[in-house]
């Protein structure tokens, strides 16, 4: 049996547990974090009819309080401070979104948002 197939079955089982368990999204995200070997997993559902998030859940290696504090600080910045949103929310976008294709290192070095909030939490990249 292929290793990825094992993960697939495991993740499917965790998905089925989400509506049955208060910690369902947390458990699923924690396992995805481990499988992908990343520092943060943020799952979002976007309603493109209104360009709003209808669901948002993030889990990472840092304590939840660190991410909650960072999210509150993040909300104080105008959306224009984060160039990822325009590309991410583009209803014409096809396929997987990866920010490294248009957010340069030079921009990151000069960005108050990246320097004060995103980088300290290990949130440089989005895919």
Regions found by a protein language model. Name each.
Residues 10-127:
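Regulatory input/activation interfaces that engage signals or partners
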Residues 1-5, 9-12:
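Short, low-complexity N-terminal regulatory "tails/caps" that precede and couple sensory modules
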């Amino acid at each position: 049996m292929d290793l990825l197939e094992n993960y697939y079955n495991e993740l499917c089982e965790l998905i089925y547990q989400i509506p049955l368990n208060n910690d369902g999204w947390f458990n699923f995200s924690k396992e995805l974090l481990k499988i992908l070997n990343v520092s943060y997993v943020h799952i979002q559902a976007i309603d493109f009819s209104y360009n709003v998030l209808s669901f948002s859940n993030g889990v990472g290696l840092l304590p939840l309080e660190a991410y909650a504090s960072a999210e509150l600080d993040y909300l104080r910045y105008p959306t224009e401070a984060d160039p990822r949103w325009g590309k991410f929310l583009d209803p014409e976008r096809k396929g997987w979104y990866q920010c490294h294709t248009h957010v340069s290192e030079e921009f990151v070095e000069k960005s108050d948002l990246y320097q004060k909030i995103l980088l300290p939490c290990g949130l440089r990249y989005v895919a």
